[in-house]
Amino acid sequence: MDTFQVIILALIQGLTEFLPISSSAHLILPAQLLGWEDQGLSFDVAVNTGSLFAVVIYFRHELWAMFKAWIASIVKGQHSDDSKLAWWIILATLPAVFFGFMAKDFIATHLRNTGVIAVTTVVFGLLLWWADKMSRHDLTIYQTGWRKALLIGFAQALALIPGTSRSGATMTAALMLGLSRDAAARFSFLMSVPVSLGAAILVGKDLAESPLPIDYQALTLGTVISFAAAYLCIHYFLKIISRMGMTPFVIYRLALGAVLCGFIFL
């Protein structure tokens, strides 16, 4: 890949990973418009790692508090709001792990195409709008509970379907269950840590066994750009939804779905 392609794809990954607008839909557009080939496994690992670093550093205080409380709940039997939240995040991760393992080959073979992504981009955009308008928005992140956490986890598993958007599906479910916009977004971001870490380990294992050459300069640049874009995205997204809700992202999803449909039918 040339430098321009690295910059564009890393920006797309960083900006769309945590917005409810589907990163897979956006990665299709440059390929369609510019005729780019697949960026390769090593680059996927690099930009995903950059996004993971961004969410870990942004929420470092919350994650550290959760980790200490989680250890205390195991070792000393001391339970607190942070330890409960940590257990809920772990519980919410399980459905995606199970269904990802069981269905990854089917999804890669049958669902990773422009038609599916166009439909899911529109349908789940409408669901996000409905959830944002109908939700009570009165529960904090510490009022999630294990039942709601598990349901949000199943929504994350549903996001294995390309175009759905992991953050979009989890935020939609959280809003439907009564969480505030800020709580829904923060729970979704925290959920991304174990999922992204697990995916990075698995894909990294495949990469280590691959005989293909690695362009370390491109990977380093992609990681740095993805990190910076994702960090800024998280910061400003939390500000936007507190003032405007999810409507701007719903409108964007509908427009993006229309563009993708144009590639199919025109």
Swiss-Prot record:
GO molecular function: undecaprenyl-diphosphatase activity
EC number assigned by the record: 3.6.1.27
GO cellular component terms listed in the entry, alphabetical order: plasma membrane
Membrane spanning residue stretches: 1-21, 39-59, 87-107, 114-134, 149-169, 183-203, 218-238, 246-266
Primary location group: membrane
Signal peptide (from-to): none
Miscellaneous note of the record: Bacitracin is thought to be involved in the inhibition of peptidoglycan synthesis by sequestering undecaprenyl diphosphate, thereby reducing the pool of lipid carrier available.
Descriptive protein name: Undecaprenyl-diphosphatase 1
Native source species: Shewanella oneidensis (strain ATCC 700550 / JCM 31522 / CIP 106686 / LMG 19005 / NCIMB 14063 / MR-1)
